[in-house]
């Protein structure tokens, strides 16, 4: 707390003096799937509606694709015989903003993956800045799905990348895997996480779809849990798990 107050005092009033190295906030190491030991929380956004569709060919810039969504492509979805609930990439967008903005992510204790409804697995770098507007997010996802990775402008670091299935190959060696179900016993997240072993991580599969069965992760999970006596959106479910882990691990 003393160091925090000295940092604030140094910055107050536009002080341009360089801070001592010991006072400069240090970014935590970036977690990757290669790290099989560090205790953390992993969130897998399962059944995510991220699907592109070609809308023009042989244009000046080549073929043009869009990210299917229920607001802009109702007519197209109808022609394809698809329900509009199958085109909800906005759910994934909301979840990513919630997760990546969280203190647990800034503390370096969160990893995020996306499993699309088409079986594509995506690793999300904790430092990536997801666009706030859905239009820009859509453009980014189209680029990712066709180029298979998005690199940082300032380095060769990959911020988003398509990786090989199955998801279990990328999880820590000791990891409790759970998924959310409205029919499962309701838990208090903080209490649940505090009961994990000292070296045990937790992986939560969250359904990033408008509706559907909760069997999307049955082949992976150890247990199904409930978070509330009321139906929750995917974004709120992500938020509750983040807050619970932050409280359990004393992340402020």
Swiss-Prot record:
The keyword Transmembrane helix does not apply. It comes from the Eukaryota. Signal peptide: none annotated. One of its GO terms (biological process) is rRNA methylation. Disulfide bonds: none annotated. InterPro entries: Alpha/beta_knot_MTases, Rbsml_bgen_MeTrfase_EMG1/NEP1, tRNA_m1G_MTases_N. It is an enzyme of class 2 (transferase). Disruption phenotype: Depletion of EMG1 affects growth and leads to strong ribosome biogenesis defects, with defects in 20S pre-rRNA and mature 18S rRNA species. Keywords: Methyltransferase, Nucleus, Ribonucleoprotein, Ribosome biogenesis, RNA-binding, rRNA processing, rRNA-binding, S-adenosyl-L-methionine, Transferase. S-adenosyl-L-methionine binds at residues 180, 207, 212-214, 227-232. Its main location: nucleus. SUPFAM superfamilies: alpha/beta knot. Changing residue 129 to A: Loss of substrate rRNA binding. It is found in: Nucleus, Nucleolus. Its EC number is 2.1.1.260. Pfam families: EMG1. Gene3D superfamilies: 3.40.1280.10. Changing residue 214 to R: Almost complete loss of SAM binding. No effect on growth and ribosome biogenesis. CDD domains: Nep1-like. It catalyses: pseudouridine(1191) in yeast 18S rRNA + S-adenosyl-L-methionine = N(1)-methylpseudouridine(1191) in yeast 18S rRNA + S-adenosyl-L-homocysteine + H(+). The record marks 90 as: Stabilizes Arg-88. Belongs to the class IV-like SAM-binding methyltransferase superfamily. RNA methyltransferase NEP1 family. This is Ribosomal RNA small subunit methyltransferase NEP1. The lineage of its organism: Eukaryota, Fungi, Dikarya, Ascomycota, Saccharomycotina.
């Amino acid at each position: 707390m003393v160091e925090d107050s000295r940092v604030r005092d140094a910055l107050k009033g536009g002080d341009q003096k360089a801070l001592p190295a010991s006072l400069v906030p240090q970014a935590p190491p970036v977690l990757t799937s290669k790290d099989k030991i560090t205790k953390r929380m992993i969130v897998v956004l399962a059944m995510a509606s991220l699907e592109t569709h070609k809308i023009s060919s042989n244009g000046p810039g080549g073929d043009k694709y869009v990210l299917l969504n229920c607001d802009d492509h109702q007519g197209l979805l109808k022609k394809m015989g698809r329900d509009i609930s199958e085109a909800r990439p906005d759910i994934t967008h909301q979840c990513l903003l919630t997760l990546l903005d969280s203190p647990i992510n800034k503390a370096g204790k969160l990893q995020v993956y996306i499993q699309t409804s088409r079986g594509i697995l995506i690793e999300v770098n904790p430092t990536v800045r997801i666009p706030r507007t859905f239009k820009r997010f859509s453009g980014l996802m189209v680029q990712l799905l066709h180029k298979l990775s998005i690199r940082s402008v300032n380095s060769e670091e990959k911020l988003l990348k398509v990786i090989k299935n199955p998801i279990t190959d990328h999880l820590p060696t000791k990891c409790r895997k759970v998924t959310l179900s409205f029919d499962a016993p309701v838990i208090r997240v903080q209490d649940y996480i505090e009961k994990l072993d000292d070296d045990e991580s937790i992986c939560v599969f969250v359904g990033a779809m408008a509706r559907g069965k909760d069997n999307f992760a049955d082949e992976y999970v150890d247990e199904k849990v409930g978070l509330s006596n009321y139906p929750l959106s995917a974004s709120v479910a992500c938020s509750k798990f983040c807050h619970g882990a932050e409280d359990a691990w004393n992340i402020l």
